[in-house]
């Protein structure tokens, strides 16, 4: 299970410090460099998406209880009658099999009846349903990254979010557990205006564009970057400057073990992944590489009941690992880096357009651009 210390979330939201409390003293076998190294936190992308229908309460619970994720990532949309719901897509086709309908064209009374295409059938949750899950006893240390999609007017969406946060009590103030992910300056400005006490993470696929936000004029802001855009010298310089400015770095969406290991070596503070269980396993292997690995947690993540169920849990994990273990061949490595090369060509071509659009304010760059680039 994930850390249950309230400091897990509070440290992130107050100082935007994402790293786990496990410290590894690395030698040459630990990925390069010496000295103490903190493992990134496991952030479950739309919940435990690798195993369950995405953005459902089942996927969120499984991410925490089965995979041991430290945090959840999900997406915000607004129904026609003003209910804040959790869905990556603005339409209902892919996840719910409904053609030619958008979320903002439907009332909640209709949306709540839909079931996912993927088994086991689940219903679309609201933001208040997720907050209810986070308010359960023992989950005080879990935090959540809310990706604000750009299909809805930001003032209306964030106003509704503010109402939900104000009307849903929790054991820890929500501004110590919630981070808003924004794709562009207009949405950052709206969060700072409507929810000024909440931290923000810039979501971007371009390190050159994101560099514009490495300024004291953008306080309380971390970076949530497309991982494959950071491979290579441009990304390395960006990571260096992020750390030099004492900002935190999250990378998305990391599902290959090689890129998980790369993210640890690069010093990422959080890793967004469809498979948080696999990432936790990679982190455990990484701990084993360290010389004199030590753990300094304020509370233990294990319990006697958890120990009694360890054998059953391990069998379940082993079954899930079937078919996803990397083959370690040079062909796989070549394929991964060729894929990165192709993506970086697209990023290089479209970044100037992105920066011009942002500069002249024609339209704020958002997730649709990332979708167009197939990132």
Regions found by a protein language model. Name each.
Residues 1-375:
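Phosphate-group recognition and catalysis centered on beta-loop-alpha active-site segments
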